[in-house]
């Protein structure tokens, strides 16, 4: 872990240090808010210049145009500036011209551009275009019966797109029965693989991606179980306790002595502290398990995740969401919003302060340096989210 991160130069939480960032109610100080807002404007200009040389054919949420549309939609929600809505609209139109008709997910497939477009058309009172996008989104489910189950390329990533639409419309535009049907397929698929590979006694559910049993949020068990425990998926109490809980507990047993988690079941190397692999993604599963099952050990494990992230989360890979400081900071915000412990808000603010010096630490340049999940757009999204910490949610993942 240590080789992949910069040593954390910051003192940990104490009340007097925290007063520079937020007051006793958790409201950011005007000075810190001003610093964040100025940096957002500065990075937006840089990002817009950089996007001129981005791949014109990448319409995805993860590295392409739909991700930039998601950022501008978020900035419109935070600041209320109609110019941001227009920017989101122009980028999502670009993304709709790049649909692959292969993957069905929000981040790496056609569901992202269609879901974001539906929401934008709705906000712009273009009802017919919004309905057209929703119809196409619902029909995506028929593309590939052998689709995997994980977040980036699988059924969970499709479910996020459906929930994203319903949440932003404030009504059930996607029928609950459609979402339930996909959820049932995910459960059946997990039971089937668990039986086939003799995991049943340890974990009633099991999932793989490219013949690997991944553990983390992006491709693995933690991301899938985080969703299966969501109230909006309506998994029955019986199945939550007989299938999901023991499977979550199996993941908990994989914890390294450090408090971090492996990338795959058979990986004994304690290396990665990323949202995609390791504690910064597993923490969401643990927090949701604590909310659903009310057992203290899930909270303790989540707090251990936060300690690992504080120590090893300022990554040399950069400032992004998937494997960077901004994505890792969201873990602190999730724990802050669960516990109201000011220590976690302070830690998120310190990681934001690291991001305020964007480009000055000698980090690696990502393959797509201005994108939502690998690059600058994700950092901007995080800095804007931090302005109202109680509303902050990891984009395209957290519900």
Curated annotation (Swiss-Prot):
Residues binding Zn(2+): 276, 322-323
N6-acetyllysine sites (modified residues): 142
Subunit structure, as described in the record: Interacts with the C-terminal of STOM. Interacts with the EPS8 SH3 domain. Interaction with EPS8 is inhibited by glutathione binding.
EC class of the enzyme, as a word: transferase
Similarity section: Belongs to the LanC-like protein family.
UniProt-annotated location(s): Cytoplasm; Cell membrane
Catalytic reactions of this protein: RX + glutathione = an S-substituted glutathione + a halide anion + H(+); 1-chloro-2,4-dinitrobenzene + glutathione = 2,4-dinitrophenyl-S-glutathione + chloride + H(+)
Any Pfam family hit: LANC_like
Name by which UniProt lists this protein: Glutathione S-transferase LANCL1
EC annotation from Swiss-Prot or TrEMBL: 2.5.1.18
Gene Ontology terms for molecular function: glutathione binding; glutathione transferase activity; low-density lipoprotein particle receptor binding; SH3 domain binding; zinc ion binding
GO cellular component terms listed in the entry, alphabetical order: cytoplasm; plasma membrane
Organism: Rattus norvegicus
GO biological process, one term: cellular detoxification
Keyword vocabulary terms for this entry: Acetylation, Cell membrane, Cytoplasm, Membrane, Metal-binding, Transferase, Zinc
PANTHER family documented for this protein: GLUTATHIONE S-TRANSFERASE LANCL1 (PTHR12736:SF5), LANC-LIKE PROTEIN (PTHR12736)
Gene3D superfamilies linked to this entry: 1.50.10.10
Role: Functions as a glutathione transferase. Catalyzes conjugation of the glutathione (GSH) to artificial substrates 1-chloro-2,4-dinitrobenzene (CDNB) and p-nitrophenyl acetate. Mitigates neuronal oxidative stress during normal postnatal development and in response to oxidative stresses probably through GSH antioxidant defense mechanism. May play a role in EPS8 signaling. Binds glutathione.
Chain residues that bind glutathione: 317, 364-367
Tissue: Strongly expressed in the brain, testis and skeletal muscle. Expressed in the neurons of the cerebellum, the germinal cells of the seminiferous tubules in testis, in liver hepoatocytes and in cardiac myocytes.
Upper lineage: Eukaryota, Metazoa, Chordata, Craniata, Vertebrata
Membrane topology term: Peripheral membrane protein
PTM annotation (N-acetylalanine): residues: 2
Principal subcellular localization: cytoplasm
